[in-house]
Regions:
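Ribonuclease/tRNase effector modules and their secretory precursors
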Residues: 1-107
Length: 107
């Protein structure tokens, strides 16, 4: 099972600056048509960026880091940043969604 966590101060700042609530952004991380890419490594932590739908209408890009939960079964996604997708990111997402899904070999 996938669980989510975030810094509440960062979430409040993100909502103010980008108009995207981290709670709503969770939907992008479980969107079956999401595009997930490696973003960067910070202090040994692999960070990903995912473009997907949130609340059925807004395509968002979410920066996050995933880790295994203490029980060794579940996964925790720590949301770091969320924003509306750029026109190019939105176009790529819509193209992939129309084709039935993302294949990493397409990159």
């Amino acid at each position: 099972m996938l669980f989510f966590e975030w810094d509440p101060r960062k979430a409040a700042r993100n909502l103010r600056d980008h108009g995207i609530d981290f709670g709503a952004a969770r939907a992008a991380l479980v969107d079956p048509f999401r595009i997930e890419e490696i973003d960067q490594v910070v202090d040994g932590e692999l960070r990903l960026r995912t473009t997907g739908m949130a609340e059925g209408q807004v395509v968002v890009l979410v920066a996050h880091a995933n880790r295994e939960a203490e029980n060794g079964i579940d996964e925790i996604a720590r949301i770091i940043h969320a924003r509306k997708a750029s026109p190019g990111e939105r176009s790529e997402y819509e193209r992939i969604r129309a084709s039935g899904g993302w294949n990493p070999a397409d990159r």
